[in-house]
Amino acid sequence: HVEGALLTETLLQASGARVIKEEVALSVSSAGYQIAGERYDQVILATGAWLGQILESIGYQVDVRPQKGQLRDYQLDLDTDEYPVVMPEGELDIIPFQKGKISMGATHENEMGFDLMVDQALLNQMETEALAYYPELAQATVVGERVGTRAYTSDFSPFWGALPNQAGIYVASGLGSSGLTTGPLIGWHLAQLVAGGNLRLDSADYPVEQYVKKRVGQKS
């Protein structure tokens, strides 16, 4: 079972890429694209539920909404290395890791915007449901909660590829709960687009123009 944060950190270290954690805006000029005072010929925007905010400044409207997700982490005094992942019908998933760690979640809250507050009552309700599948949770120690924001489109489909009418900008969003599994594949394809390489998937199956459009009255 994959620890997403650890995987991301490992890949970043292996790539040697410089990571700058900063809130930025995108602007277009005759010399290219400006981000945080730097000029670029090509840009990949993989900003999840925030894609609409980035593209709004250059005249686009984006069919992407935020969905709040919460989960709870537990520690058990058991060997969970061979425990299976349990995915019953509904929102509940129970994901065991090594050395007794188990994660339970996650909520799918469509009306909470970008709120990141933990709702203990909601997680307690989910825990009660989880006990039917993992009675051991009753003896587990709660070690923390995590809250994040997923990106969804109106039809729950992801999209990726070139931004319409704006050469050199590539976008991806709408991955929802599949980001950890499908994100690396889509990221590879975006890198291939920038580098002029060959694709394994047909980008026409994930049409950007269906979800990202120029606002009425905006010039192409």
Regions found by a protein language model. Give the residues of each.
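Hydrophobic residues embedded in beta-strands of well-ordered beta-sheets
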Residues: 32-34, 101-102, 169-170
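Glycine-rich phosphate-binding loop signature in dinucleotide/nucleotide-binding domains
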Residues: 36-39
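Hydrophobic/aromatic beta-strand patches that form the interior of the parallel beta-sheet core
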Residues: 20, 44, 170-172
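Active-site substrate-recognition segment that forms the wall
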Residues: 42, 47-164
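A structural motif corresponding to the C-terminal end of an alpha-helix
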Residues: 14-18
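C-terminal catalytic lobe of FAD-dependent flavoproteins
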Residues: 136-220
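A conserved short coil-to-beta-strand element within the FAD-binding core of flavoproteins
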Residues: 19-34
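Short beta-strand to alpha-helix junction loop
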Residues: 1-13, 117-122, 181
